[in-house]
Structures are given as structure tokens and as C-alpha cells.
Amino acid sequence: MATFFKKCIYFSYRTTTILDFCLTAGEDKLSTAVEKWHDKAKGKSAIDYGFHLMIGDLTPETEAELPQILEQEGITSVKVFMAYAKEFQATDRTLFKAFKIAKDLGAVVMVHCENGSVIDELVEEARRAGHKEPIYHALTRPAELEGEATKRAIELAHIAGATLYVVHVTCKEAVDEIIAAREKGYNVYGETCPPYLTLDQSALAQPGFEGAKYVWSPPLRPKYHQDHLWNALKAKQLQTIGSDQCSFSFKGKKQLGINDFSKIPNGGPFIEDRFSILYSEGVAKGKISINEFVDMISTSAAKIFGLFPQKGTIAIGSDADIVIFDPDVKREISAKTHHMNVDYNPYEGWEVTGEPVSVLVRGEYVIKNKEFVGVLGSGQYIKRALKTTAAEALNI
């Protein structure tokens, strides 16, 4: 995974504020992890930033510490995984506890919805059968298991009275569960990401080991799922488009799984080109309007995560965070020209229209005419307001 320093350099090329995932795995105290994340950012970021707190199974100590950390640090969002048993997967009991704590504080629980236990069994079955190709990453993580986990998370959140944010939704099965819950009045929000809207499962079946470049979780789905995602965005049943940035170089990283698909590091480089991809494939093709585009990548997220109205709008009293976007620029995406610290691009060779050309943070240029003019260390840590988060988001 890219370091915080490297991420801030190329995040600032397209973005005014980031919320980074603070990893707590392996730490006895949540506060220790948060301190480490502050140290990573100190003096290095040219844009404003905050944290999502990522938790695994809660110990009695971390369970007691969680409310205090969220309040002290102004963190309004906790992420929990229902997959990755060996690393991050939480039990349903921990997930429910997180929902209860979040409900009492007015925080949001972000959930990676896949049935990790069943996926692990399917992976072992494929390995025993001698399958090692990247395509089996997708075949062992079927959409039905994303849909099942999404429904389970929705019901647990509802019982706890909490607000749920389903991250990186990929498929019709999960979309249908979110729509059904929202129609019943549940506080559920959904996010998808550029690759799920524009790439499909066939990318993992490329000759040789090229498919490893497209291994992330949840996996890419068959192409027909894309229409369901676009339609859900248009209908505001999915509210945001996130980056899900987590890149690994092909050489030396992705290649670790050349003889075993389950050892390919999960993640891809999406952050830099996401605006151009979404504008070209969404706005330019008439799937969403320019105003909907802005809402999905900025305003709705600011409301859900307690940044609004400081961020996510241009208004008196708000931060003058502005991205100037030229809709007429045409360019070809390539790893040879991108700014990300990774040796490939999943959109290599794509011709796109539209590009951010200047970025202002609190009224000061960070990028001007595509050149970095910001000051490292000028980015500020943004504390967000608990209690107001869910209320601000209710009209989304």
C-alpha cells in the first residue's frame, strides 16, 4: 500500500480533502493507531484530511476506548469488514457492537459486505482443484455472497438503530438489498467505485498473469451489473462514488500470487483518473448529469461523514475548496504519464474526456494549470461533528 506521504502527493492532484483509513490491527490501543496516523500525515499533506477508524474484533479494552477516541479525534466513521478472516474480519457480534456504539454517538459504520467465511471455503476448494489463475479470485467471491452479507449488515444496523454505509457496492444483489431497506425507511447509504461502473470480470481472464492487475475485493462482476449500478446512482439509491484507492505494483507485489491466485494482493490504483473516467463514462454518455456527478463525488460524502457544510459546497462560511474541471480536455490514460506510485494503470490506453486542471484548498492553489504549487504540511486535520452526521445525511 502506498505510504501516506506518497498518497498525499497524488491525492492533491485531484482532490481537496481525503479521509484515510486508520488501521488498528495489531495495536493494543486504538489511540496508538490514531497517533501513528497523525505522525504519518504531520508536515506532509498539502490538502486537508481526516480519518475513518478501521476495526477488527473488539477486545473489552478497545470496545471501552472506541467512544472516547471517536469523540476526542472528531472521527465520525468506523469501518468493519465481513471478509478477510486472517486479517480484518469481524464477527457478527463485533459488528453489532460497533453499530450500537455508533448509534449512541451519531457515527456511521462503513461495512465491507462479503461473506468471508464461505469465500474462504470456496477459495480452498479452488486451490485443492489446482486452480491458480487470477480469474478464480472472482469466481470464488460470487455476487450472491455480497448480497447476503449486505442484507445481514442492513438488518443488524436496523436492530441497533444505527446508520450503515455500504462501501464499494459491485452487484445487482447488493443494490437490491439497499433499495429494499431504503424503501422501508432504514438509514442505509451505498457507495460504488469507478472500476465497478466501467470494468468487468473478463479483465481477470486475460492471458498469462495480466488479470492480476485487476484483483481487488469485492471483485469485478459480469458486465450486466454495471447498468444496475448506474441506474441506482441515477435514482439516488446509491449516494456516492468513492475511490477505494489501495494500489500495489505489478512487479514484486501482484506477482507474489503468480502460482496462487489467493496470494495476489487485493487493490488497485484508481484515485488519479477517477474524475476523467466518471465524466467520460457517466456525464458525457448521458448516464448522469454534471450536477449529479458533483453530488456523488463530493457533496453527499461530505454530508454523510460530517464534513458538510465546511466541505462539499461553495457557500459563505464554507472552506473555499474548489476543483476546476475542463470538460473539453482529451487525453490517453497511461502508467507512463500518471502521477501514482505504481507501475501499471487498469485503464491503460483509455481515451477520456475531461480533466481537473486546478485545485484550491481553503482558497489557496494546490494545483494550478496542472502543476503542483502547494506547500507540504499546509493540509489541516479536520475534526468532524458527531451527532449531526446522520441528521445532515437524512435528505440524501
Enumerate the language-model features and the residues they cover.
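Divalent metal-coordination and catalytic microenvironments
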Residues: 10, 49, 78, 112, ...
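Metal-associated gating/positioning segment near the N- to mid-region
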Residues: 1-44, 61
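His/Asp/Glu-enriched, well-ordered alpha-helical/loop segment
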Residues: 132-161, 213-214, 240-241, 247-328
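Alpha-helix-loop-beta-strand connector modules within alpha/beta enzyme cores
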Residues: 30-47, 96-111, 273
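Active-site mouth loops of central-metabolism enzymes
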Residues: 1-2, 22-24, 50-61, 139-144
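Short acidic/polar active-site loop segments enriched in Thr and Asp
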Residues: 15-17, 47, 75-76, 239
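Histidine/acidic residue-rich metal-binding segments in metalloenzymes
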Residues: 61-241, 246, 257
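C-terminal cap of metal-dependent C-N hydrolases
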Residues: 256-260, 316-382
